[in-house]
Swiss-Prot record:
Motif DEAD box in this chain: 184-187
Annotated residues for binding of ATP: A71, K72, T73, G74, S75, G76, K77, T78
Protein name: ATP-dependent RNA helicase dbp9
GO biological process: maturation of LSU-rRNA from tricistronic rRNA transcript (SSU-rRNA, 5.8S rRNA, LSU-rRNA)
Main subcellular location: nucleus
Chain's role: ATP-binding RNA helicase involved in the biogenesis of 60S ribosomal subunits and is required for the normal formation of 25S and 5.8S rRNAs.
SUPFAM superfamilies to which the protein is assigned, alphabetical: P-loop containing nucleoside triphosphate hydrolases
Catalytic activity: ATP + H2O = ADP + phosphate + H(+)
Residue positions of motif Q motif: 27-55
Amino acid sequence: MKRKLDANDVPSTEVAEEKETKDADNTDFESLNLDPRLRQALIREQFTKPTPVQSKAIPLALEGKDILARAKTGSGKTAAYVLPILQTILQKKAADPSLKATTGLVLVPTRELAEQVQSVIIKFSAFCGKDVRSVNLTQKVSDAVQRTMLADYPDLIVSTPARVIANLGTSALSLEHLTHLVIDEADLVLSYGYDEDINALAKAIPRGVQTFLMSATLTSEVDTLKGLFCRSPVILKLEDKEDEGAGISQFVVRCAEDEKFLLTYVIFKLQLIKGKVIIFVGDIDRCYRLKLFLEQFGIKSCVLNSELPINSRIHVVQEFNKGVYDIIIAADEQEVMGSRTSSKKSKEATDGDDEAKDKMGSSEDEDNEPEQSGKSARPEKRRKTSGKAKDYGISRGIDFQNVACVLNFDLPTTSKSYTHRIGRTGRAGKAGMALSFVVPADEFGKHKPTSFPTAKHDESVLAKIVKKQAKLGHEVKPYHFEMKQVDAFRYRMTDALRAVTRLAIQEARAREIRQELVKSEKLKRHFEENPEELKQLRHDGELRAARIQPHLKHIPDYLMPSKGRKGISSEDVGFVGFRKSGDNRIRKAREKNRGKGKGRKPSGVRKVDPLKTFNRGRK
């Protein structure tokens, strides 16, 4: 692997300066000597004190040093590299107002994260006027439009590696004057299949570029990127208790495959979990199967997967953070497809790193490979990552806010993925809950319609999860349901599952895509001009692909658990559709029309008996 040369053509040294930090310095944004326009933007965004990663990274970045920072999502790492880059751009523009050149490049693994970074740049450069221009290359626009956007030499570009290489190939983008390179979620960039793009980019970037590598974990992929792009980087390892799952209550439920649906129904219908919930499932079909299943009981939810247009995915996350939706069903496709993409060499390197990490007491994952049952087991075929799934990711990078619970409907295949999933809750010092469904080995495959392949290894994966969490000082507790009371709802679950056929799932997928395409493409410009009308768009509507059974939305009193009544009072339940919204519409319309005299036959007209007036035709 080619190592990056500095401005004097000297290879980077292997020894890097490490900055072990335990507590953030008592610094504020005033002491960082930022441009007044940036400080004004910080005040407007209510940034009062730098986070640990910001207080350490920003001064080093302003000194021109390369930085490799281990920082979790939500720690403020985006501002940690955006502010120094904007500061440098403003200084250059002050010295030469006519300067037009692309000096900053931010690489991210997914479109959702690109949009998130772009929004942060826009907020921080709000008072910079035309001195700072940024472009998001992941937007779904034509090549001609993208070429026009790049023709004006924007100062800062946010993109996935694939889009950068595509524009370099057409000469629409020039990196000749690049001075800053950021790779956000660096450990994901290679695992998402951007290996060739990264290698090509390493050859295209000029020497002496200041590099920021931001990652939630320090893995072999990050070491590869460090060798390609960094020059003696300063390594920041910020010890953050929140990063290790503090404040998250972790529970596990052992259940059969069809009981996952039963327990999910009971949890949401009886409101055993209150607040916003993210449900992780294994693939797109599982998304719609669960959504259609919940629709039978009047439980609304949103779907997030790689098939939906990027604008719809971003809007769903934004509305979820605002509290418009309470339940998101997310397909963690990359966790399933990307788990077998590492080569034998990288696996050996990872195993070696893990041994060292265990000795150091590191919290990194012990193995990144899914559990295989037996030595003689044939390796499963590597699933080809589609173009849509390549730049989609939901368990990492996206900053979900105020999530009360993460529900692992399908258990992830590695303890590393589990850690990233549960990290969506318990943020900013708040309490959170993680509930995982585990299928015992003797229950796997007994209910074919609801079976999922990865559930075969649930018990072995759970053992690794428990072991890792124990090292971190956390306990994964069993969550017990009183199955005698839960079984009273089983016949309803069976009726609902029977209605969610494979054909219904296919129709739901197609209908959802059609609806979201209309919202995303045709109305995009209209909503930019009329932002208030965008609030009327909802993504949790009923797909109505499955057979509707209105009686399932109502829970009779005799089904309500006797012990649970005290905890679920009528005041606490909130609105539940106990009555059908469209009940007896035709009958009500008839009664209303009778009062107006409509539909009545004129008085005096005798009723004709058809049996008396029937004439047999002659032969």
